[in-house]
A protein has these predicted regions:
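Transmembrane-helix signature of polytopic, membrane-embedded enzymes
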Residues: 94-122
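Extracytoplasmic
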Residues: 222, 407-563
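Membrane-interface alpha helices of multi-pass inner-membrane proteins
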Residues: 124, 146, 158-175, 181-186, ...
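Perimembrane helix-loop-helix junctions
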Residues: 146, 152, 180-216, 273-279
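Short hydrophobic alpha-helices at membrane interfaces in multi-pass membrane enzymes
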Residues: 143-169, 196-205, 343-350
Length: 563
């Protein structure tokens, strides 16, 4: 390793550490809060597929365990958000070590550490807790790596078992990942040279057994399957946040988004072709590899412009991911390795595309802000780059190192500098305040989020809502107002705390089904002391005409109606 490469390694490691520290302390809201409140409900005793009607509730098991452990040690939830981020970072680090070991031992990569560093800087969203998007990425990684170990380390059955268990956990994290099972079985069938049926049955049987055990628990708990089916039906029909995520209109938008990626990728490839053919005059045998390398570098530059210059926020486009996946397929056809190594890496790339398809099925976001979920495919693509045919091994090693270093630096900037885009908080330099109390104590956010959070907490201390039946009414999508439930460990009286929550006659149905969940206190979001929901909204009519409150506690950002 040259002195220059050592310096580059040092810079990338330092940047990775700083980016990881940033993820511990910056930002708070939306999906992160959603995951935490689901786990809070678990700990409070709200039953899954019973009292809970959140569409992502099967993903809550990791956060629930870590939150339970934290409360056991500290006696409360103050600062639990940063603790969960630390736990998520530790899990991510351990998986990065696994990636390093597989890259070094099984794929004989000279850049195994850099590959692991790339993985460490992958984040589907701007959050590091064990949240469903992160969990999907982690368990998909384990699924693929267990499959790699099975084929490249002696076809030991324990790796097939691990593969099936990891896929089962991935489905819990993101139920639409069930699409991965037929794809995985097809990969096993294509790669295996013997015992194809046995290997497929082993993985499928592990998944089936896991599913039967999981569903069987709820059937035994409820004394039959009818209650579970009814609850799943209500979850599907009551989830207002995802009402618009099905149907032809949604897929038309996704196809339009795919067209945007196609145009960007085509334009970048044309530029890369001109650079290599006209300016560098590359030989025909090396032309396609050089075009792919150049295209990846250009895409990294374009993405950095969107992040740093245009301030678009983390989620937007992720052009480097799309181009790297296309480049990875190109590297496969330019490779020199015999199967199963190359085919397994190609399967990893295509598997991330299947993952992205599964995410598109359930998400209420468009493809332009969802492509980061396919980032794991870049790890398999860079490993395929090592297998490409070259004339000068030393020159190729330098090119691969440079390619991986630029890609890693791009990921570090995305992870460490940007934020999830909002009105005035799209990068760390726009940080203006800190959350001082409660579960998110220590988190650094924009001014409005911090002001509302801190002042509401201070008001909360003037009333006693310990174990009260509380309904929080909020119309703000990005503000973490469901965290109010945790300020005094109140019982949640909404069937689903997905953001945005919906308030209509379904609440009456829920309270009739579960009378113990009828609210004693309703906290209504306010602006300048006035309720944000209009007087014509169903929930405000219910509060003022039917709730029979006996006391009102008012403040600038919230109004409490108390029985």
């Amino acid at each position: 390793m040259s002195k220059k490469e050592k310096w580059i390694y040092g810079i990338l490691v330092a940047g990775s550490v700083l980016a990881a520290l940033k993820m511990l302390f910056w930002g708070y809201g939306l999906d992160e809060e959603y995951q935490i409140i689901m786990s809070y409900r678990n700990i409070k005793g709200d039953t899954m597929f019973g009292l809970m009607h959140e569409s992502h509730q099967t993903s809550s098991f990791l956060c629930t365990f870590f939150m339970w452990l934290y409360r056991l040690i500290t006696g409360g939830y103050t600062g639990v958000v940063i603790w969960l981020r630390f736990c998520g970072t530790l899990i991510h680090l351990l998986l990065s070590v696994f990636v390093y070991r597989v890259a070094k031992k099984d794929f004989k990569s000279d850049n195994a550490f850099l590959v692991a560093l790339i993985y460490f800087n992958l984040v589907p969203k701007q959050m590091m807790i064990p949240e469903f998007a992160n969990m999907q990425m982690w368990f998909f990684t384990l699924t693929v790596l267990c499959l790699v170990k099975y084929f490249l380390a002696g076809e030991k059955k324990r790796y097939l078992t691990g593969c099936g268990l990891a896929l089962s956990l991935e489905v819990l994290a993101y139920p639409s990942m069930v699409l991965q099972l037929p794809f995985l079985l097809a990969v096993i069938w294509l790669v295996a040279e013997r015992q194809k049926v046995r290997a497929c049955v082993h993985v499928a049987g592990t998944c089936l057994a896991s599913a039967l055990l999981y569903v069987g628990y709820f059937v035994l708990r409820d004394g039959g399957i009818s209650g579970l089916i009814a609850t799943v039906g209500r979850i599907a029909t009551w989830d207002g946040a995802h009402d618009g995520t099905t149907g032809g209109a949604k897929w038309l938008i996704i196809l339009q988004n795919a067209g945007v990626y196609l145009l960007w990728t085509a334009a970048i490839c044309v530029v890369a072709f001109l650079v290599n053919k006209v300016i560098l005059k590359k030989e025909k045998e090396l032309l396609f590899v050089s075009i792919a390398d150049c295209a990846v570098l250009i895409s990294c530059g374009v993405q950095l412009i969107f992040w740093v210059v245009l301030n678009r926020g983390y989620e937007y486009l992720h052009l480097h991911v799309a181009v790297m996946l296309v480049a990875g397929v190109n590297y496969y056809f330019c490779g020199k390795r015999e199967k199963p190594e190359r085919l397994l890496l190609l399967a990893g790339i295509l598997g991330t595309v299947v993952s992205l398809l599964g995410i598109c099925i359930l998400t209420n976001l468009n493809l332009l802000v969802s492509t980061a979920h396919a980032g794991v495919g870049m790890v398999f693509a860079v490993l395929l780059r090592n297998s490409c045919i070259v004339h000068d091994e030393d020159d190729n090693r330098k090119k691969v190192f440079a390619l991986l270093a630029v890609l890693c630096l791009t990921l570090i900037v995305g992870k460490g500098y940007t934020m999830r885009q909002s009105r005035d908080f799209s990068n760390v330099l726009e940080s203006k305040a800190r959350l001082l109390y409660g579960p998110a104590a220590g988190c650094i956010t924009d001014f409005d989020t911090a002001q509302i959070y801190n002042r509401v907490y201070e008001m909360w201390e003037t009333v006693d809502l310990q174990d009260a039946n509380l309904l929080v009414v909020s119309e703000s999508v990005n503000s973490p107002m469901n965290t109010w439930y945790m300020f005094d460990e109140s019982s949640i009286c909404h069937y689903s705390i997905i953001n945005p929550s919906f308030y209509d006659e379904r609440l009456l149905t829920y309270w009739k089904m579960f009378p113990a969940k009828a609210p004693d206190v309703i906290a209504v979001e306010c602006s300048e002391g006035q309720p944000v929901p209009g007087a014509d909204k169903w929930i405000m009519k219910y509060v003022t005409e039917e709730f029979d409150y006996t006391q009102i506690v008012e403040s600038y950002f919230v109004r409490l109606y108390m029985r």
